[in-house]
Amino acid sequence: MGIKGLTKLLADNAPKAMKEQKFESYFGRRIAVDASMSIYQFLIVVGRTGMETLTNEAGEVTSHLQGMFNRTIRLLEAGIKPVYVFDGKPPDLKKQELAKRYSKREDATKELTEAVEEGDKDAIEKFSKRTVKVTKQHNEECKRLLRLMGVPVVEAPCEAEAECAALCINDMVYAVASEDMDSLTFGAPRFLRHLMDPSSKKIPVMEFEVAKVLEELELTMDQFIDLCILSGCDYCDSIKGIGGQTALKLIRQHGSIESILENINKDRYQIPEDWPYQEARRLFKEPNVTLDIPELKWNAPDEEGLVEFLVKENGFNQDRVTKAIEKIKFAKNKSSQGRLESFFKPVVSTSVPLKRKDTSEKPTKAVANKKTKGAGGKKK
């Protein structure tokens, strides 16, 4: 979920902290990517029509591999150096949110069964997406694919978003790419949305700068964290009746959640029982992260390994995989120049004014009605 309604809140109250950028603006930049969020998007969009998805001969879904392969190649071709960060063990405080998600998937599964019995195609499309879950197997297969492509993988001890933010704070990467807005709450200096968008539409990258967010909102980082907790985060319930705008007003007026609780009208607003907002705050301020990771290197692709994994094991088209490998090799040679050219010629800003229509909080829900080009395997 990330932070409920934060994109709209920033668009309304801190528009200068947001700017649209072209994909190519990040040539030579190291970008930490929230892998699980990307895999989830690929499973929903790539090669999916109703309940049909891309599979290999064993009937195992390959949409995540197809999406990860194609999108990573596009990043490399643009001169971007992706670092994929995978989730570790979730914090205990997130168990309640994970239980809610499980319950919603169970409900969606029941609704899907009814839709299939009734032959309701729109409902099938709707509820089949809600049953999607990123599994350990999906993660492990994507790690294997990325390593074969020569792309670095980081395994976070806990939350991937927190690890991405830590890498960015410590100048190990330029920015963080995800769809979850809590990357900002973890303090990522630069945060990118839509970089990993898997739809066929060319959606501009939305870049946020946390320093400008704080400046525009006139808040400290501690106050911004409290604002996010009040708005609604993954770690605890929020106070019913308090949305983003009200939360911002209260934080500006009182300065902290503690002060708000002392002054709030408790007849109007019901405080959750044993509300663990302090622990949620601690998880944002002191997340379980590590900087003790192998040196980030972008190596030549393992050509034989990629053919073995994608073609022989997962039914991808060999000619397309071979051509894709050539793209990876060409992109590596191109990006090896880094951003050297930018030191010798002026760079024109590619940012464009913010368009409110692109401030949706949800991941892209576009449906791939046409067969994905270069798709591996078949549909089931």
Curated annotation (Swiss-Prot):
Family the entry assigns: Belongs to the XPG/RAD2 endonuclease family. FEN1 subfamily.
GO CC annotation, single: mitochondrion
Annotated positions binding Mg(2+) 2: 180, 182, 234
Keywords carried by this UniProt record: DNA damage, DNA repair, DNA replication, Endonuclease, Exonuclease, Hydrolase, Magnesium, Metal-binding, Mitochondrion, Nuclease, Nucleus, Phosphoprotein
Tissue localization of expression: Strongly expressed in proliferating tissues: root and shoot apical meristem, tiller bud, leaf, ligule primordia, marginal meristem of young leaves and panicles. Not expressed in mature leaves when exposed to UV.
Cell compartments where the protein resides: Nucleus, Nucleolus; Nucleus, Nucleoplasm; Mitochondrion
Pfam families for this protein: XPG_I (PF00867), XPG_N (PF00752)
Induction: Induced by gamma irradiation.
CDD domains, sorted: H3TH_FEN1-Euk, PIN_FEN1
Name recorded for this polypeptide: Flap endonuclease 1-A
Region (Interaction with PCNA): 336-344
Oligomeric form and interacting partners: Interacts with PCNA. Three molecules of FEN1 bind to one PCNA trimer with each molecule binding to one PCNA monomer. PCNA stimulates the nuclease activity without altering cleavage specificity.
GO molecular function, a single term: magnesium ion binding
EC nos: 3.1.-.-
Gene (name only): FEN1A
Organism: Oryza sativa subsp. japonica (Rice)
Binding annotation for Mg(2+) 1: 34, 87, 159, 161
Residue numbers spanned by region Disordered: 351-380
Cofactor: Mg(2+)
Signal peptide start-end: none
